[in-house]
Design a protein with these regions (language model features):
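Catalytic machinery of carbohydrate-active enzymes
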Residues: 1-195
Length: 195
């Protein structure tokens, strides 16, 4: 049994290494060539919403020297092993309705020259490709997109701008996900901020 497991793991490791060498690296090299050679870069993302927001620092950094267009694909099926009963879009990453709600926010970002729903436009960088990388997806990371583009944005800089809203002037807004919650957090510490 020990020998079987050793051979299985060795074969699996070899297979992953070949996949990395023959599939992942060439694709990342394609992305790099687009970045080096083009003045306008088109990006594709199909979500989740948080993943799209996480891609913005990388796009913003590239926008310093490029015109950046972002296309968002609707109704891309989530693989069966990753479907969550709590996911707001069911068995797809993003519904068309979700995208239509997100696009006005994205259009306010000055570094995005164009934001549209994907309808077979030519794509230079598929931001969904991070899902092909051999990384842990249980950890939500803005840095996934650096692996695809070779760019490393300063995450202390603002990358999502919204107009101020007087309604929430003296409010603390907490963003929570149905899939990722920490029931150990006691929010009573926020009471010290009450004016």
């Amino acid at each position: 049994m020990k020998k079987f497991l050793f051979n299985f793991l060795k074969k699996n490791k070899s297979s992953n290494s070949e996949r990395y060498k023959n599939y992942i690296i060439p694709k990342i090299n394609e992305f790099s060539k687009s970045i080096e050679s083009k003045n306008t870069i088109s990006f594709l993302h199909y979500g989740h919403l948080g993943d799209i927001i996480n891609s913005l620092p990388t796009i913003k950094l590239l926008s310093r020297t490029k015109n950046c267009h972002l296309y968002i694909q609707s109704n891309k099926k989530i693989p069966n092993h990753a479907i969550s009963k709590d996911h707001p879009s069911g068995d797809v990453y993003l519904t068309r309705n979700s995208i239509l709600k997100l696009i006005p926010l994205l259009k306010q970002q000055r570094f995005l020259h164009k934001v549209e729903t994907f309808s077979n436009q030519k794509i230079d960088i598929d931001l969904n490709f991070f899902r092909e990388l051999p990384i842990n997806f249980n950890i939500d990371s803005v840095r996934w997109y650096s692996h695809l583009t070779g760019t490393f944005p300063d995450l202390s800089e603002t990358y999502l701008n919204v107009p101020s809203n007087e309604k929430y002037k003296n409010s603390i807004v907490i963003m929570r996900s149905l899939r990722r919650q920490n029931d150990k957090i006691d929010y009573s510490f926020l009471s010290s901020y009450i004016k």
